[in-house]
């Protein structure tokens, strides 16, 4: 067998003790300067900016630490290939323009794979859902469909048979 550790690569819980000091700084900002917010079940989050070095470096360092300290084989980056990218208008962030969201994650995946393989040459990255822009850096994807969706995972599997696809079925609702 092999072990995979979980990291949410996208959101920050607003109830966290660190949201006011760190989470607010990492948040993607809309054109009014407000952070993008999302709700999953009863919990509320801000969306982190993957093209800003603050979040990017924290994510990379945490994932590398997991492989180095715990000896796990891979890292699962939740939401990375699944959720909507946003333009970030935060002038304090390190990105050069507002549209670098996806490029930020490409950098994370490329750099993370390089770092992980220093510690374990067989290390791998998994993400939630399939993103062809990210696929050359991942070993596999956790895929799922809601009742209203057909995101064509069978077509993806047919087109890219070398990718591992874990199909999740989760019938429980938030109610």
PLM features per residue range, with description:
Residues 76-98:
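Active-site-proximal loop/short-helix segments
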Residues 3-6, 75-77, 125-127:
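Hydrophobic faces of well-ordered beta-strands that scaffold small-molecule active sites
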Residues 13-45, 49-50, 103-175:
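Glycan-recognition surfaces
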Residues 59, 66, 78, 125:
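Conserved, mostly hydrophobic/aromatic
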